[in-house]
Amino acid sequence: MPLPPPSPFHQHIALPERTALLLSMLAPWPRRGRELLVIGCGAGHVLPPLWQSGFDLSACETSPALREQARRRAPQGVEIEAASPDWLPFADNSFDWVLLRADELPPAALPAALSEACRVAACGLALTFWNSASLPWLTWRLHGRRHAWPGHCLPFWTAWRLLAARPGRLHAASCLWRPACRWHHGTHVHAAALSRLPFGAWCVLRLDMSPRRTGTPLPLRLRPRLDTARPVMEYDSLRTTGQPPAQKQHP
């Protein structure tokens, strides 16, 4: 029997855990002067945390009702476009980073959506989805709770194979290891919950298409240290001779 489509009511389920995992996975991406496109932003719950973490944001959503909710939640200046994940009205390499939220996307539509996301992404792509190869999913199926699962889902290895065919380095992480009936009990977010094993109910895959660049450089440490402030030109003689330069005698 086919599963019912996900309800927008379930988009906030386990939101702190999922947001913490997403921000942890996107942490290596540089922010300064870079733009992130969120495909399928839904009701916009994810937009404020991404904006607060330093990304310049753009977003798109198919549903008019969800677009209106996203506009109310989005930070000032964030554009919410009307676009389908499998056809984006953007030129190639229009955005540095792309986040494709496949939480409410039917599995059959994922290959076309990934193709479009990779087309408009210049440096990296992240994919979020509900994982059917997880203990919570199996528990939910055994108890027959077909009406309670928060979104469309697919096995982890299916999403991995689709992204592994693209050039770049692939990373994975997941959260929500407990049965779905325990997600409503508001747990504290710990680092242990952000597992790099892809067997939780909600997964994030990150594809880095370009080599990672360094961020703000650390201060250089000069050895031996100067005991007093001196002009930079004089330090070269100290480094080569090991002795401080002779002081000039003024008449």
Task: Give the positions of each predicted feature.
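Class I SAM-dependent methyltransferase SAM/SAH-binding core
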Residues: L37, G42-W87
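Short alpha-helix
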Residues: W149-W177
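A short SAM/SAH-binding and catalytic strip from SAM-dependent methyltransferases
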Residues: D96-A109
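A C-terminal cap/extension of S-adenosyl-L-methionine-dependent methyltransferases
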Residues: H171-P251
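Conserved class I S-adenosyl-L-methionine
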Residues: M1-R32, H45, G124-P150
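A short glycine-rich, Lys/Arg-flanked "PGG" loop and its adjoining helix->strand segment in the class I
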Residues: P111-L125
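A short acidic, Gly/Pro-enriched loop at the edge of an enzyme's catalytic core
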Residues: D86-W97
